[in-house]
C-alpha cells in the first residue's frame, strides 16, 4: 500500500487508547449527568464523567433511550428567541462580542455534549452505535432529525478521509475481523469459512477495508476484488468453487464485485467513492498491466420498475430484457434527474460509466427476484473520473458507452411501436 496508508497504520497504533476503566459515581439521571458534563471544566473529571454517561446509556431500555433522545432534542436545542435577539443586535452593531455570542447560541448544546462524550476511551464506537439506535426511531419521531443533523455533522468530521486507514484483508487477518467481514457482507452472502477463504486467500482475489483509528478492529466498509483476464460477466463464475486461479501476469482487469457498508450508525457518510478509487490506484501501481477497472453490480430496482411499467411480457425475450435494462439504467430518473436505481446512482455519481449489461449474471434467488438475474458492469476510467463526476453533478447525465445508449434507444422504439407498455418514466 502507499506511504499514506503506512502512516495511517502508524497513526492507528499511536492513537490506540490505553486501557481505561470507566468509573465514578452513577448517581443522578443520565440527563443530569450530561448537564454536569457540559459544565465540567477539568479534562480528567470530564473524561470519567463521559465514561459514566456512556455506561449508563448502555443500561437504558427502549423507553429510557426514547427519554434520552427527547432530552437531547428538546433540552439541549438552540434557544430561538435568544438567537433572534442576538441576530438583531449583531445586525445593528456588527460587534465582535455579539458575533461570538451569536455563533455560540447558534450551536445546540447537544453538539458539545457529543464532543465531550467522545473524549472517553472507546467512545467513538459507542456514539456510532448511539446514532444507529437514533436512526431506528426517526420514522416514529421525525423531530429527532434535529439531533441526527448534529450527529452526522460531527461524524463526517471525525470520519473524514484523512483519518481512514486502508488495509488489505487476507487469510492471515485476525479471526475477529474475518468474522465481521462474514457478518457485514451485504451483496453476496459468505456461506462458510471455505467460501471466505476463496475470496481472500488466492492471489487473484483481494479484499480491502477502511478502518478508523478509534475503531481499529471494526471495518467501516470493504470491497471484494477479482483479478481476471477480461471483464467478468457472471457472479457465478467469480465465486465458483471449481474455478482455477490465474497467473497475475495474465490479469488485465480488476472486478469490484461486492462493496459493503458495515456501520449503520454511519449511514449517510460516503466511504465507497474514496475506497474504490484508492484501491484502483493502489492496484494499478502494484500491477501496471491492469488496464480495466469495472464493477460487477446488482440492479436492485429493475424487477420492480419492469412491473410498474407493464413490461413483464416483453422481457421474457432476453434480447428485449437487455434493451429494457439499458433503458432503465440510462433513462429512469427521479424528480431530481438522478437515477432511481440506488447502485447506479452511487457509481455514476462517483465518476463511472455504464459499460456492459450481462444476462443470467446472478442466478441466485435474490438476483432473480430483484433484477431477473441481470447484472451490470460500471467502468472506472481513472483518467476520466473527475470529468464524469462534474457532468453527472451539473447535468444529471447518466454516462454510458455507445453500445448501452443504442440499446436504450432500441428499447424505446420497440416497446412504443408494439404498444406493450406505459410511457417510460423519464
Q: Which positions does each model-derived feature cover?
A:
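Extended, composition-driven regions rather than compact fold-specific motifs
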Residues: 1-426
Amino acid at each position: 500500500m502507499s506511504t499514506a496508508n503506512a502512516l495511517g497504520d502508524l497513526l492507528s497504533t499511536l492513537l490506540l487508547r490505553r486501557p481505561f476503566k470507566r468509573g465514578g459515581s452513577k448517581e443522578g439521571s443520565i440527563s443530569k449527568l450530561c448537564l454536569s458534563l457540559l459544565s465540567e471544566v477539568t479534562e480528567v473529571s470530564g473524561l470519567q464523567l463521559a465514561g459514566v454517561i456512556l455506561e449508563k446509556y448502555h443500561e437504558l431500555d427502549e423507553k429510557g433511550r426514547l427519554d434520552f433522545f427527547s432530552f437531547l432534542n428538546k433540552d439541549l436545542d438552540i434557544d430561538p428567541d435568544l438567537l433572534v435577539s442576538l441576530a438583531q443586535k449583531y445586525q445593528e452593531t456588527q460587534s465582535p462580542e455579539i458575533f461570538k455570542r451569536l455563533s455560540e447560541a447558534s450551536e445546540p448544546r447537544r453538539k458539545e455534549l457529543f464532543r465531550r462524550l467522545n473524549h472517553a476511551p472507546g467512545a467513538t464506537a459507542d456514539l456510532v452505535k448511539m446514532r444507529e439506535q437514533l436512526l431506528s426511531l426517526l420514522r416514529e419521531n421525525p423531530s429527532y432529525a434535529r439531533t441526527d443533523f448534529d450527529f452526522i455533522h460531527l461524524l463526517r468530521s471525525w470520519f473524514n478521509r484523512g483519518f481512514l486507514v486502508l488495509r488489505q484483508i487476507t487469510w492471515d487477518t485476525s479471526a475477529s475481523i474475518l468474522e465481521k467481514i462474514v457478518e457485514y457482507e451485504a451483496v453476496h452472502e459468505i456461506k462458510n469459512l471455505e467460501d471466505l477463504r476463496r475470496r481472500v486467500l488466492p492471489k487473484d482475489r483481494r479484499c480491502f477495508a477502511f478502518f478508523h483509528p478509534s475503531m481499529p478492529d471494526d471495518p467501516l466498509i470493504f470491497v471484494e476484488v477479482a483479478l481476471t483476464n477480461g471483464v467478468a460477466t457472471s457472479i457465478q463464475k467469480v465465486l465458483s468453487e471449481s474455478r482455477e486461479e490465474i497467473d497475475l501476469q495474465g490479469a488485465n482487469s480488476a472486478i469490484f464485485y461486492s462493496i459493503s457498508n458495515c456501520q449503520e450508525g454511519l449511514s449517510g457518510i460516503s466511504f465507497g467513492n474514496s475506497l474504490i478509487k484508492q484501491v484502483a490506484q493502489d492496484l494499478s501501481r502494484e500491477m501496471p498491466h491492469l488496464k480495466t477497472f469495472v464493477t460487477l453490480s446488482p440492479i436492485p430496482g429493475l424487477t420492480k420498475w419492469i412491473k410498474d411499467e407493464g413490461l413483464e411480457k416483453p422481457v421474457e425475450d432476453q434480447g428485449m430484457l437487455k434493451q429494457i435494462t439499458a433503458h432503465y439504467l440510462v433513462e429512469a430518473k427521479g424528480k431530481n434527474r438522478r437515477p432511481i436505481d440506488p447502485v447506479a446512482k452511487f457509481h455514476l455519481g462517483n465518476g463511472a460509466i455504464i459499460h456492459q449489461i450481462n444476462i443470467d449474471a446472478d442466478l441466485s434467488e435474490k438476483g432473480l427476484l430483484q433484477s431477473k438475474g441481470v447484472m451490470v458492469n460500471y467502468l472506472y476510467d481513472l483518467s476520466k473520473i473527475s470529468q464524469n463526476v462534474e457532468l453527472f453533478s451539473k447535468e444529471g447525465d447518466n454516462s454510458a458507452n455507445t453500445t448501452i445508449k443504442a440499446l436504450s434507444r432500441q428499447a424505446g422504439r420497440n416497446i412504443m411501436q408494439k404498444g406493450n407498455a406505459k410511457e417510460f418514466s423519464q
